[in-house]
Amino acid sequence: MVELTEFQKRRQENIKRNNDLLKKLHLGGAASRIKREAGVDDTHRTVVKKKKSPSVSRGRSASPKVAPVATRRSMRLRGEKVDNVGIPNVSDTQLMKMSLDGTSGSSVNDKELVDEIKDTPVIGDVKLSDLIKDEKEENLIEKFKSFANKNFSSGDFFEEIRKRQMENKAPELQKLQDDFDLQLYDVFQPNEIKLVYERITATYFHPSLDKKLIVAGDTSGNIGLWNVRDEPLSENGEDQMVEPDITKVKFFTKNVGKIDCFTSDTSKLLTASYDGSLRSIDLNSLQSNDILTLRNEYDDPLGISDFQFSYENPNVLLMTTLSGEFVNIDLREKIGEQISSNLRRLSDKKIGSFSINPNRPYEIATGSLDRTLKIWDIRKLVKKPEWSQYEDYDSCEIVSVYDSRLSVSAVSYSPTDNTLVCNGYDDTIRLFDVGSDNLPDDLQPKLTLKHNCQSGRWTSILKARFKQDQDVFAIANMKRAIDIYDSQGQQLAHLPTATVPAVISWHPLRNWIAGGNSSGKIFLFTDETVKKEEEE
């Protein structure tokens, strides 16, 4: 008998482990259980036979018996052993695709069970080590411990904004263009940096200054954390087998809508999903807590499309939904009661993006599928708004409205100079001056830029984002690049990429930017190469 290789042995162990797991979950009787619930039960069905009445023989000759034909039986019924039977040793997403295509050899019941497992969310508080089989808990904690150190704080971020606000004159255009002449990260190639399995829908650049941490989420609810390596690989071949340090975990059943960190504690991440879930990740202990599942009065989940912490109170979180609702909650109080009393309707359709005005924190801007950009005063309540077809929730007072030709994908406020940027499916970027205390009802842009930002089915929606410490914004380009502009519409940089880096995220304190594409990969641009050359 030929001896199995190490890889084949490991594969057999994985198959055995998966089959044992299915047995423990009692999945074998799932089909019978479903039949019983539907009222169709073959095992308990009794066949009522009619009594045979005695018949008088009439001398009829017996018909000749037909020789029995052998029935087809499966190898399992014949008692024959089949090698490599069970669920293949692949990821959940690959297994789902194989089941749908019929290439995995699984039965119909297996496909139904795969679908059921796929739609089962992570409930309650968990440790990442419980969801990641191939890494030990102590190794995971050691990997992210440096990001949990308190060597930086949200206070540093707000001090930077104050310093910018004290500057009377904007930097020269040439200096800005030099500052944002960024270089592509080259320790690993972008096609090696695969943070998640599917199309990226959210990215986040952690504010740590000592080390870089980039977090991404995809359409299947996976979260990927990339501990960026800054040291170049050795030229003597010692690091030939080294791969990017990426940790993947699945928390949600639908798109990851937003990733951020707590304003009061940057060692904790906050993640939200289209399935209505809001979860935290503690980088110090790698504990993930279930904060809430946003639901309406009928107990249906409301998909969270965007969230942002209040500038006035770091414990207050503002959120928008896929069906047009808005809510603000204090994370220190009981959340359930707040949702029922604070839920407002700001649109009859999806709100894809919203932003808080840093100079007037009681004002927010929303971009919606209803083809409008609206500015709201969330202090003022409006009962039964005339513009809405629904009568389920109260609304807020509308300050100003801009009507777009097509849907508005994103809105973002500049940190200091009262500029609001929006982009949409009409292939434009529009800049608005919102510094006045009395904005007109009909808002008009101060500048309109043509931009290739109409994404298709296979690319995430492109969204313009202002940098949090400078009046500079960036947006991905369908011609495979990241474009950077100042708040006056002057282009500062054009950073080419191999594919469309649709979902971008700024580092809040450094000139670093990351963009995620439709296959789960990340492009990272920094100014560190330029600085090293200047020092030399």
From Swiss-Prot:
SMART domains listed in its UniProt record: WD40
Alphabetical GO biological process terms: DNA damage response; regulation of DNA damage checkpoint
Annotated region described as Disordered, given as residue ranges: 36-72
GO cellular component: chromatin; cytoplasm; nuclear periphery
Sequence ranges of the WD repeats: 195-236, 251-291, 346-386, 403-442, 456-495, 496-535
Pfam families: WD40
GO molecular function: DNA binding
Keywords on record: DNA damage, DNA-binding, Repeat, WD repeat
Compositionally biased spans, kind Basic and acidic residues: 36-45
Cited function: DNA-binding protein that binds to both single- and double-stranded DNA. Binds preferentially to UV-damaged DNA. May be involved in DNA-metabolic processes.
Family: Belongs to the WD repeat DDB2/WDR76 family.
Protein name: DNA damage-binding protein CMR1
